[in-house]
Amino acid sequence: AEVPAAADSATVHPVPLPLAPDAAVQWLAAEQSNSSLVIGESVIVKLFRRVVAGVHPEMEMTRHLTRIGYANTAALIGEIAHESAGGERSTLAVVQSFVPNQGDAWTWALDYLRRTIDELAVLTEAVSAGDGEMAPTAVSEARTDTDEALAGYLAFIGAIGTRLGELHVALAAPSDDPAFGTGIANADDAAFWTARVREQLTRALDHLAAWQAANGPNADVDWLLSQRDALLEAARERALGGLGAMLERIHGDFHLGQVLVAQGDAFLIDFEGEPARPVDERRRKTSPLRDVAGLVRSLDYVVGAMRQGPEHVAGPAQERRDRLLERFLNASTERFLDTYAAAIQAPPSEDGACALDMDLLDLFLLEKAAYEVNYEAANRPTWLPIPLAGLAHVARRLLHADVPPAVALDPLGGPP
């Protein structure tokens, strides 16, 4: 809703800020729905370009998390709000403590993977150039370095799982505020989930058909188009299977870009949800597995971006790179899910499998991958193969079709 221009006012209740009179001001890169500036490296002001009437999710969530003492986010200091002549309130900006950081987890992951691949390339070239007696030693050293690099990557991805789990536990705690606490999924929630998946999947399949017509045959696209009705029915069944699941407030737009890397720990930011969605929908309690799906897809995306990136390799070098990326993807996804499940104290299943509701998680993974197809079709068609592969993978799992097994491959070519 637009804020009326007449008879409006903006009220500010002074709050002491730890700022020097000559504190430096730094504008950060503009995001989709907001612009931010850092003042004195102690305060960050987020200005919303999409002003909406009523309770703003970012303000509501950060205020609640600050009140209950959730540590791994930027604490709320205050807000700048507009109030119309009729008493309708709109948040124009929020003021938060600044978290000193080394950047977001998306950039960190890209840099980490790129560095690891470059180092592997140097080592494998040395192996190829070495004599027969030295080759086994060089191979052993290369494998050790790769294992150490993987351990470092998994340590931080595991921290994200822990912090997200702690966030969900905090948001599920009993509260005097009815906007928080938990609920139970009912038929309306299942219908809502089904409708969202139907909306995204239908559009995605239409985009894929058009993309294939312009780019030539693609086996994944052919298969997905042939399974349209079966996928929609499988999504409906998964949504109904979620009846009785716990609901709560969630982050709502969780991915690696919403995580700050700070002194080796993970800080979660940007709680406004998907900006294009209606505010009431963003504030609705839903399954926390929606956030989990967002991060799982983001882990896949960063690997896809590495394959899609400017590094042009071919032949054995490409095969080694792809094996390494697949190993990192499989291991990081498993570590994230394990640490998340441990943080929420999810009871293990009888067969020792993942303690989370994987059927419901797959529903949200399907929706997220379809959303990504729609986004790339509209904005970056050359990136569309990344979500296409993810959509085909989760769709095959939903329909119990043949899915290539995830194998921990040695990037140097032999068994791990």
Task: List each language-model region with its residue ranges.
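A structural signal for well-ordered alpha-helices, especially hydrophobic packing surfaces
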Residues: 168-171, 201, 205, 232-236, ...
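Conserved ATP-binding subdomain of kinase catalytic cores across diverse folds
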Residues: 1-210, 256, 262-354
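ATP/Mg2+ or Mg2+-diphosphate-binding catalytic cores
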Residues: 219, 313, 320-349, 360-416
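Short amphipathic alpha-helical interaction patches enriched in hydrophobic/aromatic residues
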Residues: 212, 279, 374-377
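Conserved catalytic-loop position in the HRD/HxD motif
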Residues: 253
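Charged, amphipathic alpha-helical oligomerization/scaffolding segments
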Residues: 159, 166, 196, 223-230, ...
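Acidic, serine/threonine- and proline-rich low-complexity regulatory regions
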Residues: 239-242, 249, 277, 346-360
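An alpha-helical support segment within catalytic cores of ATP-dependent transferases
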Residues: 7-23, 204-249
